[in-house]
């Protein structure tokens, strides 16, 4: 990665002894890029590039869901996977306050607090998985099982 500073997500992966590679992609400073564009920018199939979504349940607890960038979260299935009656996406303005990350740079690893985290089960069929490196412009790639373990996550069918 050269002289670029490591993110909290990268430091956590290293402490967990997870082998990963970091991949930079072009972007305007502070401007989020959609996941399908990110996949194209790093030359990868969108099926192996995952996005991190943050929700709040009817209990007022926060939950993190990680799904392929071209997929849509099934809110009912997501709620069932965490034992909630319902979940709703948090407002974009609350992302930093809740996670410590910015929109477009939200990693499932290294948030301010450890939230219940669920990856879509499709991740298990991927030989490698990309997720945000913890800032806009950086993706990390590693084995799916390693990212799931580092995020202290489970898996479930949570997309349509």
Q: What is the predicted function of each stretch?
A:
Residues 1-160:
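Extended, low-hydrophobicity, polar/charged segments
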């Amino acid at each position: 990665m050269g002289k670029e500073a490591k993110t909290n997500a990268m430091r956590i992966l290293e402490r967990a002894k997870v082998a990963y590679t970091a991949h930079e992609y072009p972007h305007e400073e502070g401007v989020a890029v959609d996941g399908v564009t990110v996949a194209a920018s790093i030359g990868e199939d969108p099926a192996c590039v995952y996005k991190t979504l943050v929700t709040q349940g009817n209990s007022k607890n926060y939950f993190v869901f990680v799904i392929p960038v071209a997929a849509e979260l099934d809110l009912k299935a997501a709620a069932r996977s965490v034992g909630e009656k319902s979940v709703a996406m948090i407002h974009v303005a609350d992302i930093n306050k809740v996670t410590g990350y910015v929109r477009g740079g939200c990693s499932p690893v290294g948030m301010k607090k450890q939230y219940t985290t669920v990856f879509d089960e499709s991740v298990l069929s991927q030989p490698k998985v990309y997720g945000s490196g913890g800032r806009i412009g950086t993706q990390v790639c590693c084995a799916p099982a390693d990212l799931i373990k580092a995020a202290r996550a489970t898996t479930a069918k949570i997309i349509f």
